[in-house]
C-alpha cells in the first residue's frame, strides 16, 4: 500500500498520540488530587506533630518545622469528628527570638501557607503559618459546581450568572454534607480558634499578628477573643465587619483619588480632563464588541475593580495603570483593552478561590449583605464596586446557597480592644479603602495607630513596592510599638506602563487570527499539493510531521477559540471537547 493511501501514517499516529497525551494532561490538571494532610491514627484534639523541613522564601530556604494540628471540626458539638490542619514554623535565626509572628493571608478562599516574605521577619522571630480549615487541611471545601457555573456564564455579573452561582453553591454544600462534612463548623471564628489552638500547642505565651485584607478580620476577632495572648498586631488593607462588600460611594471616592493623581500627570491629564468622570461615563456605555470580538460588560467592570486595587506593576495585567489605560483608550474609541479584560475575567475568576471556604468566611457579613441587597444593591451594577459586590454575593443569592456557621453573627460590629494595633492602608486601595479603618475601627482602638501610604494600593502593593520601608514599619512596631515610616519616599502612580492592555489585546487577537489563517491555508495548500503532485517526499514529509503539528495544533485551537468567543459565549476556553476537536481535526 502506498503512502498516499494509508489511513494512519506514522506521522498521523504520532500526532494523535500527542493529542491523547495532551488531553490526559488536561484531565490530570483538572482532576488531580491536592496534597492534603490527614488526622494521625489515635490523635486527639490539640495534638501537634512536627518534623524538620525547609520553607521557601524570597531569600532562599529557611529552616522550619512542618506538621499537623488536630482540631474538632465543630467545637460546638462534643461528638464532632476531628480534622487536621497544616502548621509550619519558620525558625528565627536569633538565639534569643522575640514574640513569634503569626501570619494571616487574605482572600477569602486563599491558602494561608505560602508567604515568600517570611524572611523579612525571621531574623529575630519565629514566623508561623496555620492552615485555614476548609482550604488547607484534611477537609477542602472545593466547589467544582461553582467553577463550572462561572465558566459557562455569558457574563459574570449577569442575572443568569447570579442564579447559576447560587444554585451551584447549594449543590456544593449538599454534596459536602452528604460526604459527612459539618459545614456549621467552618467560617472565620473557627479559623481564629484554630490559631489559638496552634499557639497553645507550640507553647507560646504571646504572639504578634501580621495580617492582610480578609485576614485582618481574623486578626480583629483574635484580639477580641484572646487579647491576653496578643502582643501587637499589624493589619495591612484593613477589612472591618460589614466590608466583604463594596458600596458605590466609597468606590467613587477612590476613583476621585486616582483622578487627582491623573490631573498631576502630563500624560494622563492630556487624555482626560476628569479621569473619574471618564470611568463613570464609560462604565454606563461599555461597547458590546471590539471589531467582531464580543465584550462582556460585567466582566469588564469586575476585572477593572480588582485591577484598580493594586498600584504595583507586579500585579499586571490586573494593575491600576493598565486598567485605567484601557478606560482612557475606550474613551478614544479603542475598546481592545475591554475585550482583553473580558476574556481575562472569564479565565481567571472561576478558579481564583476555593469557593466553599470563600463562602463560609464571607458569611461573617451575611447580615450586612442581606441589608445591602434588600436596599436595591442589584440595581446599580454600573459602578465598579457594586459590580464586584454583585459578583461576590451572586446578587445576594449566595446567602441562600451556602449554610450559616453556628456563630457567624457573633462579630457583626467592631468591638473595643486595648491591643496595640497598627493599621496600614494604601491611599488608592479600592479593595479595602483606608477610610474604612479610619471611620470604623480606629475609634475602638485606644492603643491603635494608622498609616495611610500615599500612592499605594492594596496588600500586594505594600509587599512589592518599597519593601525595605515596609519591613521597617512592621518590625519597628513589633519591637517597640512605635511607628517608623521614615524610609518611605513619595510613591508615584505610573500612568504609562511599559505594556498596556490594548497592546496585549491586539497582540493576542493578532496571534490567534494569524495562526488560525496559517493553519487553514496550510491545510488547503497540502490538500492541493497532494492532489496535483501526489505524496510528499521523504524529507518533506519528515519536516511536516515534525513542525506542522505545532502550527496546525495551535492554529486549529485558535480557530476554535475564535468560534467559541464569537458564537458560544457560554463555552469555557479550557473545554476539553473544544481542545480535542480544534487541535485534533487539523492534525489528524
Could you tell me what each predicted segment is?
Residues 454-462:
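Histidine-bearing beta->alpha loop at or near hydrolase active sites
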Residues 430-436:
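Conserved alpha/beta-hydrolase "acid-adjacent" motif
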Residues 177, 189-206:
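Conserved acidic catalytic loop of the alpha/beta-hydrolase fold
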Residues 143, 148-152, 219-282, 304, ...:
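A catalytic-pocket lid/entrance helix-loop region that shapes and gates access to the active site
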Residues 417, 423-425, 429:
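Short beta-strand/loop motif that positions the catalytic acidic residue
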Residues 9-15, 21, 26-35, 276-416, ...:
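Alpha/beta-hydrolase fold active-site neighborhood
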Residues 436, 461-479:
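Post-His helix in hydrolase/transferase enzymes
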